[in-house]
Swiss-Prot record:
Residues 1-18 form the signal peptide. Residues 23-46 are annotated as: Disordered. InterPro entries: Allatostatin. GO terms for biological process: neuropeptide signaling pathway. This is Allatostatin-A. GO terms for cellular component: extracellular region.
């Protein structure tokens, strides 16, 4: 009898010692009011938020601004984003053309007549020179037209280039200025027009030679064969 009661006593004492103790501040798990307060405390962040003086850093902004756009107005520049002073470049329109839609909408709202509307669209007929800013309208594939008299389209100081030369430099291969128009097959009409197959019409000092008659033997018919170059 005593031998069977001792193990039972040890089991009861061990279970009592291993049971978790409830602290004085711990709420009763069967209390409904305490359970509601625990659910409310779960929504409170365990750590306090950063002070407004230290809300900058990686991924942190100095101010909170919720917008539906991708970038803030102060950060609208970057790759593929240019502000209005930098809207020119390759494939970028000038500032004046960017404001075309706004001006057109304003005219539509004012209900102007058809004549004023047609005059407005005539200002933007030529879209070639509007692609770039006016000081940068020259380049590869962009040349100043000879028949174009508008100084606003292209700068006249840059109208030369590949295949385009100023009047001062319009000589070259097959092109010679009037003071340099002599050469192979090109002679001046005055004192340098003699040579291979070329003779002076007035001066007969160089009309003799192998197979060449002198000036005394030359007839009037032969003189008609000569012509000025």
């Amino acid at each position: 009898m005593l031998s069977t009661s001792l193990p039972v006593c040890f089991l009861v004492i061990g279970a009592a010692l291993c049971a978790p103790e409830r602290m004085q501040n711990d709420p009763d798990p069967h209390d409904s009011t305490a359970q509601g307060s625990d659910n409310h405390s779960d929504h409170i962040a365990p750590l306090a938020k950063r002070s407004p003086h230290y809300d900058f850093g990686l991924g942190k902004r100095a101010y909170s601004y919720v917008s539906e756009y991708k970038r803030l107005p102060v950060y609208n520049f970057g790759l593929g984003k240019r502000s209005r002073p930098y809207s020119f470049g390759l494939g970028k329109r000038s500032v004046d053309e960017d404001q075309t839609n706004d001006d057109q909408q304003q005219i539509m709202n004012n209900d102007l007549d058809q004549a004023a509307l047609a005059e407005f669209f005539d200002q933007y007929d030529d879209a070639g020179y509007e692609k770039r800013a006016r000081p940068y309208s020259f380049g590869l594939g962009k040349r100043f037209a000879d028949d174009d008299t508008s100084e606003e389209k292209r700068a006249r100081a840059y109208d030369f280039g590949l295949g385009k030369r100023l009047p001062l430099y319009n000589f070259g291969l097959g092109k010679r200025a009037r003071s340099y128009n002599f050469g192979l097959g090109k002679r001046l009409a005055s004192k340098f027009n003699f040579g291979l197959g070329k003779r002076e019409r007035d001066m007969h000092r160089f009309s003799f030679g192998l197979g060449k008659r002198s000036a005394d033997d030359a007839s009037t018919e032969d003189s008609d064969n000569y012509f000025d170059v």
